Curated annotation (Swiss-Prot):
Tagged with keyword Cell division: no
Reaction(s) catalysed (UniProt annotation): a quinone + NADH + 5 H(+)(in) = a quinol + NAD(+) + 4 H(+)(out)
Gene3D superfamilies: 3.40.50.12280
Record-listed E.C. numbers: 7.1.1.-
Enzyme class, UniProt record, top EC level: translocase
Gene Ontology MF term list: 4 iron, 4 sulfur cluster binding; iron ion binding; NADH dehydrogenase (ubiquinone) activity; NADH:ubiquinone reductase (non-electrogenic) activity; quinone binding
Ribonucleoprotein recorded as keyword: no
Residues annotated to bind [4Fe-4S] cluster: C53, C54, C118, C148
Cofactor: [4Fe-4S] cluster
Biological function: NDH-1 shuttles electrons from NADH, via FMN and iron-sulfur (Fe-S) centers, to quinones in the respiratory chain. The immediate electron acceptor for the enzyme in this species is believed to be a menaquinone. Couples the redox reaction to proton translocation (for every two electrons transferred, four hydrogen ions are translocated across the cytoplasmic membrane), and thus conserves the redox energy in a proton gradient.
Homology family: Belongs to the complex I 20 kDa subunit family.
Lineage: Bacteria, Bacillati, Bacillota, Bacilli, Bacillales
HAMAP family linked to this entry: NDH1_NuoB
Record protein name field: NADH-quinone oxidoreductase subunit B
Length: 177
């Protein structure tokens, strides 16, 4: 098996060449961190935090047509049971401390998806005195999904990108910004 340019060869006693070839095809070697990341990436539990129009599109992802459950994601209503916060809609300065409190109540590891133009950059209300110019000013964001509003397929794509990010960070040990 080759990993990062290093060839790993296992020498076993009393094993025939045929058995060794069978083991190479059927034995999977990994690290515990990669195994945990694989499990976490395939069982994301998003906290629904709908603030505006994008929330309606987010609800569509849970319907039978898109069926987010088939990807191992189940919407949770409590931050203590969630590991992904999906912020969909305009975040006002009055709502900002509540968003931060919900984020702080989530257990580690935790991730944030900013869904829609309003959550990512303030949207059409960006010049208003009471609108936060992107949820990344309150909590760290892992995935941005553009659109006004983004369709459910875009949210599924964003969730899949988050899964890839989780696995990549565990494999390389590098934080992806």
């Amino acid at each position: 098996m080759e990993e990062e340019g290093v060839k790993m060869d296992v020498k076993l006693l009393n094993v025939s060449d045929q058995e060794m070839e069978e083991m190479r095809r059927n034995v999977f070697l990994t690290t515990l961190e990669q195994l945990k990341a694989w499990a976490r990436s395939n069982s994301l539990w998003p906290l629904t935090f709908g603030l505006a129009c994008c929330a309606i599109e987010m609800m569509g992802v849970g319907s039978s047509h898109y069926d987010l459950d088939r990807f191992g994601s189940f919407f949770r209503t409590s931050p203590r049971q969630s590991d992904v916060m999906i912020v969909s809609g305009t975040v006002t300065k009055k709502m900002a401390p509540i968003v931060r409190r919900l984020y702080d109540q989530m257990p580690e590891p935790k991730w944030v998806i900013a869904m829609g133009s309003c959550a990512t950059a303030g949207g059409p209300y960006v010049k208003s005195y009471c609108v936060v110019k992107g949820v990344d000013q309150i909590v760290p964001v892992d995935v941005y999904i553009p659109g006004c509003p983004p369709n459910p397929a875009a949210l599924i794509y964003g969730i899949n990108k988050l899964k890839e990010k989780i696995r990549y960070e565990a494999k390389t040990g590098k934080k992806v910004l």
